[in-house]
Design a protein with these regions (language model features):
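Conserved P-loop NTPase mechanochemical-coupling segment
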Residues: 130-202, 231-232
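Electropositive, surface-exposed helix/loop patches at the edges of structured domains
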Residues: 7, 108-145
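Walker A/P-loop nucleotide-binding motif
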Residues: 48-69
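Conserved NTP-binding/hydrolysis module of P-loop NTPases
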Residues: 93-114
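Conserved catalytic segments around the Walker B and adjacent sensor/switch elements
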Residues: 73-91, 307
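C-terminal alpha-helical "lid" subdomain
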Residues: 158-181, 297-421
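A short, basic N-terminal segment
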Residues: 1-51, 380-421
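The catalytic "switch" region of P-loop NTPases
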Residues: 2-6, 178-341
Length: 421
């Protein structure tokens, strides 16, 4: 990609608020403290065992941008990185729905496209790694997963490869179809117990974690965005979501070298945890069901969200650095000279957005729009301030009254109309 194309790509994504593609490294200013701490956590995960982290910020103040910066930090340190934004379709209380979306946005270091196929396809069926993997899967995972790996690594049917790989990424292969593939490959019947995606999804997570370490990568970073959407679930859904967060914090849902990172809105504590009294009620809802493990995990998950590290506002110096990069990109993208510096553009933006709590996203888009207008018209845009907003009566009565004053005859009903009534 040329320098001009790269600059235009950055500007279009900044205008729209959509994160850059994972392969494009973002600009990062004012986050050195958090990234240094996360770098230490990555070292610990690679050398010892899993850790967890949560960060909080207001909407539009850079949570997703910081996650993308961590994405690149982890990738540079030989970590596999997965990203998922919670939605109505992928709620945190349903890990069976989370898993396929998570794997669909999983990148190996240096990869231009997502996916985990390379973790398996690079294994030789007769290699010690393959034998170790199959033996571990036989004793530690659901028999279905062992059968999938057995057929994938040692089976003779190449037609089934895509189907078997698809199951590792989406959990969508039925046991009946797996038995058919197994009989084709080995001419023997496969005995496999019932598989439940909701119950056994943990084994898929454990398998990916094992494959990552087996193939020589440092570990696995999982980035959860929009965690505040947990607050839109019902009370049971919220309790289960907190428990899953807690399980990821306690032991990574049975994984070894994993760093889950949760990005949550800063008002989640007051608007959800306090207002709905989830700190007390959520563990109680699980206790009624007699699940002591879930109760402890729920408390741990709530504590993690309570202690989320708050993103600090960008300083004027950070803004000037960021805006200087923005000016350079804009001038490179459209081959012109603005005559502005990061400091002068910051003064213009700050004069318009005087509120101290103005969103980072608002100021950034304002700066881009200023440069766009300056480039298009050759002069700085004129700023008009509107003082006061009044209510406007949009009902039909005032218009009808005004019409009656202008033309009384038109407003009076005709005789025919009276007869019809």
């Amino acid at each position: 990609m040329t320098r001009q194309a790269n600059a235009r790509l950055r500007l279009e994504h900044l205008r729209s608020g959509v994160p850059l593609p994972p392969t494009v490294e973002p600009w990062v200013f004012g986050r050195a403290g958090i990234l240094t701490h996360l770098a230490d956590l990555l070292d610990t995960v690679a050398a010892k065992s899993g850790r967890t982290y949560a960060l909080a910020a207001n909407y539009g103040d850079g949570k997703t941008h910081t996650l993308r910066a961590l994405w690149h930090l982890a990738s540079q340190r030989n970590f596999v990185v997965s990203t998922i934004a919670l939605t109505r379709e992928t709620p945190l209380d349903r890990l069976d729905r989370i898993y396929p979306k998570l794997i669909a946005d999983t990148y190996l270091p240096g990869a231009a496209q997502p996916g985990i196929a390379r973790l398996v396809l690079g294994l030789d069926a007769d290699s010690p790694e393959s034998h170790r993997l199959l033996e571990w899967a036989r004793t530690e995972l659901h028999p279905k997963l062992h059968a999938v790996l057995h057929n994938l690594l040692e089976g003779q049917s190449t037609e089934a490869t895509e189907v078997l790989l698809g199951d590792l990424e989406r959990m969508d292969l039925g046991v009946a179809d797996l038995k058919r593939i197994h009989r084709t490959n080995f001419h023997t019947a496969l005995k496999a117990p019932r598989f439940s995606a909701l119950r056994d999804v943990r084994d898929y997570l454990r398998l990916v974690d094992y494959l990552i370490r087996l193939r020589g990568y440092a570990g696995w970073v999982i980035l959860f965005d929009e965690v505040e959407l947990v607050g839109r679930l019902g009370r049971v859904g919220r309790a289960k979501s907190y428990a899953n967060i807690g399980r990821l914090a306690i032991d990574g849902l049975g994984t070894g070298h994993v760093l889950p990172v949760f990005a949550v809105a800063s008002n989640f504590y007051t608007d959800v945890l306090l207002r709905r009294n989830d700190q007390q009620l959520a563990p109680d809802w699980l206790a009624v069901r007699g699940d002591a493990e879930a109760v402890e995990a729920c408390r741990r998950g709530i504590a993690l969200l309570q202690e989320a590290h708050l993103l600090q506002p960008l300083s004027p110096a950070n803004w000037q650095q960021f805006l200087q990069n923005l000016i350079d990109a804009h001038e490179s993208a459209y081959d012109w000279s603005s005559g502005l510096t990061g400091q002068s553009l910051w003064e213009l933006v700050r004069a318009i957005t005087t509120e101290t709590d103005t969103k980072v996203r608002v100021r950034l888009r304002l700066a881009i729009q200023w440069l766009d207008l300056l480039h298009q018209y050759g002069r700085p845009p004129t700023i008009r301030t509107v003082h006061g907003i009044g209510e406007v009566d949009v009902s039909e009565e005032p218009e009808a009254a005004a019409a009656a004053e202008d033309d009384p005859a038109a407003a009076a009903p005709s005789a025919a109309t009276e007869d019809e009534r």
